[in-house]
Swiss-Prot record:
Native organism taxonomy: Eukaryota, Metazoa, Chordata, Craniata, Vertebrata
Residues covered by region (Serine protease): 213-373
Gene name for this UniProt entry: Htra4
Enzyme Commission code(s) on record: 3.4.21.-
Domain of life: Eukaryota
InterPro entries on file: Growth_fac_rcpt_cys_sf (IPR009030), IGFBP-like (IPR000867), Kazal_dom (IPR002350), Kazal_dom_sf (IPR036058), PDZ (IPR001478), PDZ_6 (IPR041489), PDZ_sf (IPR036034), Peptidase_S1_PA (IPR009003)
Domain PDZ positions: 384-476
Keywords: Disulfide bond, Hydrolase, Protease, Secreted, Serine protease, Signal
EC category: hydrolase
Name by which UniProt lists this protein: Serine protease HTR4
Amino acid sequence: MSRSKMSSQRLWAVRAQFLLLWLLLWAAPVPWAEARRSRVSLPCPDACDPTRCPPLPSCSAGSALVPDRCGCCQVCAAVEGQECGGARGRPCVPGLRCGAPFSREPSGRAWLGTCGCAEGAEGAAVCGSDGRTYPSLCALRKENRAARQRGALPAVPVQKGACGDSGTTRAGRLRTKYNFIAAVVEKVAPSVVHLQLFRRSPLTNQEIPSSSGSGFIVSEDGLIVTNAHVLTNQQKIQVELQNGAQYEATVKDIDHKLDLALIKIEPDTDLPVLLLGRSSDLRAGEFVVALGSPFSLQNTVTAGIVSTTQRGGKELGLKDSDIDYIQTDAIINHGNSGGPLVNLDGDVIGINTLKVTAGISFAIPSDRIRQFLADYHERQLKGKAPLQKKYLGLRMLPLTLNLLQEMKRQDPDFPDVSSGVFVYEVIQGSAAASSGLRDHDVIVSINGQPVTTTTDVIEAVKDNAFLSIIVLRGSQTLFLTVTPEIIN
């Protein structure tokens, strides 16, 4: 065989081997071929079928379940440094972004990237315990990993925002959207005042605190509305504003039947005022906010809804009352009396008056307050001073059958009586307190006349300079003499 023929055969053999090797490589699932196929984007279905989703996976630390690229199934998001994208478009955890490769892929192909910090995220800066401001929490963690590798102390995120931030940064989207109560309080609180009442001690002749309450400013020159039962005569009334300024107040008008009072301070500057809304427009279910100073804790805020807009006084056992109270589940505690009940517009729709139990409180409607202020203004225009009024200094209820049964259930020693007026609070420092009346006494007679309703007591106070009262207390029958206080 000639040499040229042998060389030709060897050449064809080599070519055949290369061809066979190429065919084998093309058919075999080698890694680079599999990687190439994985970079082809999988199409999203026309309609999601949750039953075809795989079981929920257990995500590694730092990861979280998020919707996949198509929004059909839940997948574990990639954390920093892990691959993202690919055929199924694996997402990164919130706060990270999937970094794209430098080369542009053809249309319809998916690229594999790496999750990393989202640079330049607005408002994502954090302050570290090392005093440095990092562009994001992700950037701080990246620095911490490098610090641990070189044996340095990692920094702890101590504050959202720059280290020099004074804390007055704008609230986040959710806080801005849902914290409507805070917006109401910010608007209303400067007009709410704390009332501290003092009485003179008979032993030391010094003024000592006797009770407290709340009120709200209705005129720039210092007129303040509160509850009548908050005030007692012959006492010093000290008003403290939100800014801490203190003034002594005088009583301008008082109506014990409405349980409303108007006092006046002499401020150095104009004061912020609250406007009265229309309680007749109030609807059951509306959000309301109660502000005041319960237990002398100033600037206390509670919120709730209106349970009913017209709870008649007769339903509360107040047979002589013609007021339809606003019932709310906003908590009104002792000391909250006289504070405003406002709607979400910041308008006063009631004055906090009475708490029966947790979740059941009552307010006098603003329409009654408006009429009270209008009557006062009319008297001022006509030059008429308000009539002298007498003040006993107690809060009372007619002793109904239901109330009698409840009191006997709570106190086995409660007087065995079928009618009378139940005293549920005696105002400290008042004429009633000085005479010896106590909480939970039962008044059965005044000046020889039987007493069955609160109207009997009010009329007796109005028509007499002094009162001879028969009181039942437990198993005792007491005879007390009371001289009502005169209020101008």
